[in-house]
Structures are given as C-alpha cells and as structure tokens.
Amino acid sequence: IDQVMNEGRLGVAELKCREFLKKNPTHTYAMSQLSEIANRLGHFDDAELLLEKAVQFNPDDGELRMKYALVLRKKQKFAKTMEQVNILCDKYPDNLAYQAQKASEIMQNGQHEDAISLFDDILSKNPHNFSTFTSKGHALKTLGKTDDAIESYQSAYKIRPDHGEAFFSLANLKTYSFSNPEFMNMKEQIKRVDLSLRDKAYFHFALAQGYESNKQYDEAFFHLKNGNQIKRDQSKYSIERMDNELQAQIDVCNDEFFKNLDIGGNDTKDPIFILGLPRAGSTLIEQILASHSMIDGTLELPNILSLAQSLRGGDIYGKLGNYPKSMGSLSSDQRIDMGRKFIEDTQMHRGSAPMFTDKMPNNFRHIGLIH
C-alpha cells in the first residue's frame, strides 16, 4: 500500500486499504493510511473519523494522535486540536515537536506571550530548530516587536538557508530591506532542482517584494508570476466553484427565506462582525473599534468557517453537505445552539470587554449564516 501511495495511485491504494481493513478492522496503521488518502483528496471528514477511531484503538501512539490533531486543525476545530495536543504533551513532555505544536495552538488562541515563552523553552533545548525560530518570529511580529521578529527570522535562515518561509516572512514585514548577500542566496536557491515547491514559491514572493522595493518592477512581476503559478498548480481553488457558491448564497438567502424563519439564533449583542472582501480595510476598522474600552479586538476568528464546514459535511447537524440550502431546514433550537456554541467557543479569544470583533475575511461568504 505504501508503495502504491508513493506512486500517487491513490484510488488503488484506497481499495487495498479497504480490503485489508475488512479483515483487520482495528489495524491502526491501515486506518492511518486510509485517512492520509482521504486527506490528500480533500475528504477531511472521512480523515477525521478514521483517525478518531484509530486513536481510540491505540491511544498511546503519539504520531497517530498528532495526525488526528493536525486534521482537526485543518478543519478549524481548534478547541479539539488543543485538547489532543495537551494529551500529547502530558504523555511525552520531552517531545519538542509536540511542544512546538502546542505553542502554535496557543498562538492561534491569541496568547502570543505564552507561545513565545514556550518557543524559547524549545530553543533552549534545541537551538538549531529553524522552524521554531520562524514561528517565534510570527508571534513577535503580531505583538509589534518587529526588530525581534527580524532577528528570529534571520536566525531561522542562518540555520537553513533554503528555508523560504523565513525570507518570505521578512519580505512580508513590508519594511525590511534585503541585503545583497540575502538577494544572492534567494536567487541561488530558486535555481535548485531539489528545492521543494513550497520553499520555491516563498522565495519567488520574497524576491518580488525585494525587487519592488528597489523599483525593479519587471523583475518583481517575473517572480510574482512564477510564485503564483506554483501556488495555482497546487491550489484546489476554482473560480467557477466560488461563483456557484456565492450565487447559491444569493439564491437561498432572499427576503422570503428570512421571513419564513421562526424564532431562533442567539440574540446576544457581544459579537461585531466586520464583513468585506480581503484587503478592503477591515484591519483599520477593527483597530478603530478595538480602541473602545467596551470592545475586545480578536482579529480573525475561524469559528464561522468551522460552522459552515460542519454544515457542508453533515458533521454536527446532519445536513449531508447541502449547504447553504440546508440552512432553511435548521430548527430554531439548532440555530440557538449554533449561536450559543459560537459565543462559548470564541470566549478563549476575548478579554473582559462586553463586546468583541470578528474580522475573518472569508466570513463574507457566510453572511446568511451569520444573520
């Protein structure tokens, strides 16, 4: 099965896994491999279910539980992800990979100072962990500690010069100027045939930013084009699918739809949703609102996206993937439950203010669900 998967013949590998599991229904490695196939095909609900059962059969397999946690994270179930990562860290306190994942989850929850402390603890034990330096840089950047973030990103690429994310992160600061040696390194790296496409895309985007800053616009567009081509080839994004999704929202969420709804939903005034297309100024609006003492700025919360995903997959409310049409068949109790769960799950991101912001850019795709 492993060989067939490595050859990319996922259909054959899936059949072999299923045949094997019919005879060995509790074989956790086979379940893990089948979940990997589902994961590669974008069937995250199936991957989650398989790994959940596998972990139940073999709760002491740390790597299996880590795979489960990462699938939960991919599905934006961050509370459940944190639960699994905590189990891993309790069971294997000396495993730095699990500690690093915990730090990333803490950072996801907005506890950046705590995350930095954990990153520093990891680096004290393994000072050559380049990815931890990069993650620490992200946390420092979020806290506005730009100079410290730069130092952390530079530490990452000094350990591994082909670590494209570190260079991209420096470029993404928008204020950083690459030195000549840094430029030379990036240009040499993208020539390598053995460089991963992920790193190569990062280098192209970093070079594009660097050339743009130097007013060398032809070179900047060249690298933007190449970086975006790599991302396009790897992406499952479809303009047609997006058009169909948005048209379905328009068709479903009309006047009649809302008039036919009875009572339901959570009537709390706590959340303030900042809706609009990405790069339309939502950050500025969030900062203005969050400057008020009665409003917590929580940045981009994933909860609405997770809720929409659950309705697509029949995960919680059993709507079998018919979103957004399925919203019309939700009972008032189900809508109240969804609102209650949103308030409870977002509590970890809030301070003590009575209201909070949610500026997740992709929430504009779910205006009907929010309403």
Q: What do the PLM-derived regions correspond to, one by one?
A:
Residues 64, 369-371:
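Short, intrinsically disordered, charge-balanced linker/junction segments flanking boundaries
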